[in-house]
Amino acid sequence: SGNIMPRPSLRLVVFGGFSAGFMLFMGMSLQQAGLVYTTAGKAGFITSLYVVIVPILALFWKQSTNPGTWIGAILAAIGLYFLSVTEKFTVEFGDLLEFFCAFFWAGQVLIIGWLSPRIQSVKLAFTQFVVCAVLSLMVAMVFEDIAWNALVQATWPILYGGILSSGVAFTFQVMAQRNTHPAHASIIMSLEAVFAAIGGWLLLNEILSMRGLMGCGLMLGGMLLSQLWGIKSRTTASISD
């Protein structure tokens, strides 16, 4: 009975779900807008800088973490650079949008990390998606020309992105962050870039260069370091007790 979560107040569900949904909406919107003005590789790298931003912002929430997480986050960021940025790095307008996007992704991870132990996972995820969907529809109706034929032609990509990439993935995030430090979660989720590169190599016959492989290795190393350091710290603490 000690593991039963107390019933959250309606105010917490609404406020928390709106906060997480707004962060999700802003992160997705800025990411898509930035892609119009920059390359996919640079966008992937800059957006994933949330892996470093999360532990920094967590300090303001008084959520300290161990040195292994900081080192792991920096290794992951360096690995992302090698994996994502191949051309000469110059700052464009789209890069600034992606940079602001990274802060909203970091905020979403931190908010979910705070809410997930307090609100049932499915309830929090559902509220987050409803808020994000409503805000996205409102913005689309104002700034986009919505054509039914275009929606029909993009049915499967829309369903995949909405159900699997967003619905399933972000619900798993909410469930996992009940027992995971936000900084650790951000490092693990940054491995999205590694899976994308490997998937492109296996399924689309894309070339994975030595530079890309080195980037993947650094990111995997950063993830393992952050996790193993935490295990070592907990083991040492239990022995001393």
Predicted regions and their residues:
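Cytoplasmic-side transmembrane-helix entry/capping segments in multi-pass membrane proteins
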Residues: L12-S19, T65-A77, D95-E98, I119-F129
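Hydrophobic core positions of alpha-helical segments in small-molecule transporters
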Residues: I46-L49, G68-I71, F93, F100, ...
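Hydrophobic transmembrane alpha-helices of multi-pass small-molecule transport proteins
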Residues: T65-V85, W105, V134-S136, G199, ...
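Hydrophobic/aromatic residues within transmembrane alpha-helices
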Residues: G34, T39, F60-T65, L115, ...
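C-terminal transmembrane-helix exit sites in multi-pass transporters
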Residues: P6, Y50-I71, V194-L213
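Hydrophobic alpha-helical transmembrane segments of multi-pass membrane transport proteins
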Residues: F15-Y37, L57, F82, F99-I111, ...
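Transmembrane alpha-helical segments that form core, pore/gating elements
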Residues: V54-P55, E87-E144, I158, F172, ...
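C-terminal-most transmembrane helix of multi-pass membrane proteins
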Residues: S1, A154-W156, S190-D241
